[in-house]
Amino acid sequence: MSFDLILFGGTGDLVWRKLMPALFQAFRHGSLPEGGRIVGVARDDLSDDAYRALIKSRFDHVELAKRPTDEEFARFADMLFYLRMDLSNPLDYPRLESKLQEHVADTVVMYLATAPSLFTTFCEQLANAGMSRPNMRIVLEKPLGHSLESNRAINSAVRKVFDEKQIFRIDHYLGKPSVQNLFALRFGNALFEPLWRREDIANIQITIAEDIGIEKRGAFYDGTGALRDMVQNHALQLLCAVAMEPPINAHADAIRDEKLKVLRSLKPWTPETLRQHVVRGQYGAGSVDGAAVAGYRAEAGVNPSSTTETFVALRCEIANWRWAGVPFYIRTGKRLAGRSAYIEVNFRPAPHAIYKSPLGAGNRLVIYLQPKDGLELHLFAQGQQNRMTSNTLAPVQLDLDFDKRFGSERVGAYERLLLDVIDGRLNLFVRSDEQEEAWRWVEPIMQSWAADPEGPRLYAAGTWGPSASSAMIARDGFCWSEVC
């Protein structure tokens, strides 16, 4: 199957840090279909060869399992081409059409690695130029809008040109191997699903922590914040994966129907729960890995009096028979004490204790997403001392490291998702109604913050966020995993 993959924003950060390395890995693994072209599109004045040289130079600064040899990159570079184009200029679209006519492809993928403000413009100009066709697919990066209203406007503009089956709204967390293994763990094994219910689970925690700051994205981040950047998409998609009912089959819409039910079952916010169950923070100066780092307001491109949040922690509940009364805790932030992303399922203690164990202790299942990729099951076993007579239990853990088990060059998130787009598989992509429900649920939080004169709570860089985050979960008698 021949394909054209058109990367708009072809000289941008996302393309050289994530997309090109993923495409190279797919090429190295022999997964890219033969007869394909990868066309970078940007406003820079570059030749094909100059673009290839630019990508090669950038490969020295990205994560790859193994550096490409000159011969290996040369073979990959044979697929790379470049087109100078301004998406906002209607006069440039005939040049795009000419580029597509150079290569008759079975599938044409339009990947918009650009600012969301250009999504509507691109679709309108594509339609005006008469260039939309059934073999086209469009990939949209998050954040898809700034609010429920803007999200609907973008989706409306895109659907005027593309059918829903042609639209791939990407959330790279869904491409992570551990997330896919969460589906396999739940729906491919009979062990856990009978316990996956309110009677056996005390709480579920979702953590997406970064130790880096905003790097060079000050202007973008200051207009976005952690709620829009991480919670509305990544965190809520992870919540859906862990809480959804078994789908009737493995087809895309069957999976997305069940995720939609979870989003629609989230308890709506009230003034009281907004005060008690939502914490926003902003990092101040501190120390990360022994090095002093500046506070958020001192970062380049950030308003010195900014109230943009770099940390969010919240408590939510799902109002259905499986999960009623079980608290779900979500937290995400920049400049935290470590880089990690995981889902922790905390089971209830044994109902009748005949052994001595830590007070209130229950089993835990931890699904690690990054940097580790694996599962840990925390159990209790009889202690080593006085084994013949002791009735004291000690914690033990079963550890499955997917990288060690299946090899360190497994398919990464973007590699998997890019191949899915080329092949037309929608299972790991987000449908428009899912996005709208997610925006509908987070919008009251944004509105309450806009009316709050106090702004975010300050936390020192290199810590786990504001103390109010720990106080929030402690009110339920629980604690975050790093302190339990």
Summary of predicted features, one role per range:
Residues M1-V139, L144-C484:
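Secretory/organelle targeting and membrane-embedding segments
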